[in-house]
Swiss-Prot record:
Name this protein carries in UniProt: Small ribosomal subunit protein uS4
GO annotation (BP), single: translation
Gene (name only): rpsD
Cross-referenced Pfam families: Ribosomal_S4, S4
SUPFAM superfamilies in UniProt: Alpha-L RNA-binding motif (SSF55174)
Domain S4 RNA-binding: 95-157
Length: 208
């Protein structure tokens, strides 16, 4: 196991949930259910309300691979929108182009999806993009660049991920043409997150 996987493994154990949605971390949690450095029943000392909020915020931060500044800005945007702030926050994270590439099965992980976008492999509405943080809207279309080598890579990823995760109902994936259409924003019950978004809202609201 390389250093990056070890670091991810420690995060999964710290949070007690498989935030990276990969089978190997489910196995790790079964084998080592305690947080790093903790053993037996004393998994964690009593956590303050602030500590709980911080943990939920960190879960989302590491799940989606965003920086502190990015998450703060996403929260500010979610608060400006109509509706429930926590729901808006998660929907904005889900509609990031790197996350859509991941959800569509074009990448085996979100980190891999960010790499794919950064390398210019993805087209957005016919134009090459290299910014993983772009927020997609209804009727946006993303497509794999017209190169046989790239298409072969993505098709291989689709094959690997097809049995591991279900496609979201708010996107339409054409596996033959390797494109994805955003049909609408996701609703809260369509977002498979392991974090408590209300605690994240409370965390940022106290610092606004």
């Amino acid at each position: 196991m390389n250093r990056k996987n070890i670091a991810k493994g420690k995060l999964v154990r710290r949070f007690g949930v498989n935030i990276f949605e990969q089978p190997k971390y489910d196995k790790l949690l079964k084998k080592k259910p305690n947080a790093p450095g903790m053993h037996g029943r004393s998994r964690r000392a009593k956590i303050t309300e602030y500590g709980k909020q911080l943990i939920e915020k960190q879960k989302v931060k590491f799940t989606y691979g965003v920086s502190e500044r990015q998450l703060t800005n996403i929260f500010k945007e979610s608060r400006r929108q109509h509706g429930v702030t926590g729901d808006n926050l998660l929907a904005l994270l889900e509609r990031r182009i790197d996350n859509v590439v991941y959800r569509a099965g074009f990448a085996i992980s979100r980190a891999h999806a960010r790499q794919i976008v950064s390398h210019g492999i993805i087209m957005l509405n016919g134009r090459r993009v290299t910014i993983p943080s772009i927020t997609l809207r209804a009727n946006d279309m993303i497509q794999v660049k017209e190169k046989d080598r790239l298409k072969k890579l993505v098709r291989s990823n689709i094959e690997k991920t097809s049995t591991l995760r279900k496609l979201p109902t708010w996107i339409e994936v054409n596996a033959d043409d390797l494109n994805v259409k955003i049909t609408r924003p996701p609703s809260r019950d369509e977002i498979p997150t392991l974090a408590n978004e209300q605690m994240i809202v409370e965390y940022y609201s106290k610092r606004a």
